[in-house]
Structures are given as structure tokens and as C-alpha cells.
Amino acid sequence: MKRLISLIVCTLLMFSATGLAYNATNEVENISMDDDVPVWENGDSWRYNIAKLSFQLNQSGQQMSLDMSMTDLLIDVIGTTETSYKLAVSGNINGLFDYDDGAGTTIGGILFITRISSGEIKIRKADLAAENAYFVIKSIALVLEHPLAPIPLPIPLTITININQEIPRSLIDFPLYDGKEGIIPETNIDANIRVESFVLKILHSLIHDFPEEIYVEQNVTLPMLMYTATEEQVSVEAGNYTAYNIDFFEGILGSIYYAPAVGNYIKAVAEINTMDIMLDVKAQLKDTTYR
């Protein structure tokens, strides 16, 4: 469970400063020689779609998986100070989940009605590093596989996520230029996730295999990342852009695409597959108010 939470936290941070943009003329934007940190203003917003966000974990007999998509994930700049931005986050989530503890208990089902009801992220102006984040996710999970099978159980859930980055770091090493190479240093993240439901409390009183609530608190180490930034023409849902393909470990861990014309990412692709862990992310820009 802790390693699955680690993957979720890392993915949230990948998108924590992500914005997706709209180009009304669908024309290719040009990049200057060096592109520095963009300036955001109150009211700037970005919207994007995550076509795929999948996790699978096999460890010590336990098997866990989460297969999601997110539509209209909206990020708004709602506050600024001399040193930071305050972002609001909202969006809808669809997906499937499955858990097998390896000892005979299996729980699985559908995230039927799920949304990020509230979310805030603090971003450092100097480099767009995420300092901390807070999310509240409301869900009605239709549990299809459980100790009471074959009776489906609709369970309302409230999921609260807190993330603090010990030494904030950005996935973009500004200023950018074509052919730039470098290293993003490792850092630590303190994260806690709480899953609550009155139905879980009732079921726990009847069946001890059901947890009363789920709470995970963990310090996650994000490793050092070697990257290369290459200028490319990139086509996404919003249009065509000249962007930097920032790939990590020569693309082995995936890439993020940053377009100076929109002041943010326009695309993210990650696919990690080992014997124990699988992570698959595909996201792209939809629209923005940024100019």
C-alpha cells in the first residue's frame, strides 16, 4: 500500500504545476533562444484531459491496481504573493480499482461518481516548484468484489490528501534551451492520505475484514533525475506548438512537454514497467486563458 501511495503522490506532483493551453489560431508558436520562468496572473487557468492514469503493484503477495481517467482537470491561479502562486484544482475522475491482500481478501470495484471537490497547490514563483498541496476527493465507489460477494455495495468515500515537499524542486530546470542537459536533485516528500466513510464504519462493526478507515502517512524520496530538453513541434488537442520535450533518463521514465507560449506543460507521457510496479500516464492540453 505504501509503495502505491508513493506512486500516486509522485504522479500528483508531476501535474501539480501542469497547465494546458488553447491556441485559437492553431498556429505554431516560436521559442526564443533561452526561455525563462513564465509569469502567471490571477485568473490564468489551464484545463487538460488525462486519458490514462494507471498504477499496478505486485509485492509480497499483494496485488493492487488503479486504472483512471480524468476529464476537464482545471487549474486556476487564485492568489499571488511576492514569492508564490496559489492554485485551485478541480476535476472529474472515472476508474476501476482492485486489491488482493494475498491472504484471501479481495476488494474491487468502480469509481462511479468521483470528483476533486476542492484542491489547492502552492507553487514557488522562482521555478514553478510545488511547495505543498491539499486535495479532497468525493466518490461513490461501487464495490463489486468483497467478502460479501456477490452483493454490490455502493460506498460514499471522502479521500483527503496532504503533500509537503521538504526541499521544493521543479521538474523544469529554467532557463530552457534546445539541447540542454542536466540533473534535477532528489528531494523528500511528506504525504498523508485518509479515506473515510460512514459505510466503512458500519461494515467494520459487522465484518472485521473491512477497515474502519484508511490512513497512510509516509515520507517519500523522489530520486535524482537526469534530463535532456529538445525543441520539437508538438500537436495536442488544443493545437500545434513548438515545445521542449524534457525526457528523463533518455525517455526511459517518460517525458513532459513545456511550451513557453502557454507558460506551462502541454503534454505528459510516462510508462514505467518493472516486475513489481507499473505506471502509465498519458495527458494533454485542452484549453487555457493564459496569454
Region annotations inferred by a language model:
Residues 25-178, 186-291:
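Acidic, serine/threonine-rich low-complexity disordered tracts
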Residues 1-4, 9:
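Positively charged n-region of N-terminal signal peptides that target proteins for export
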Residues 12-17:
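Hydrophobic core
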Residues 19-23:
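Boundary at the C-terminal end of the N-terminal hydrophobic targeting segment
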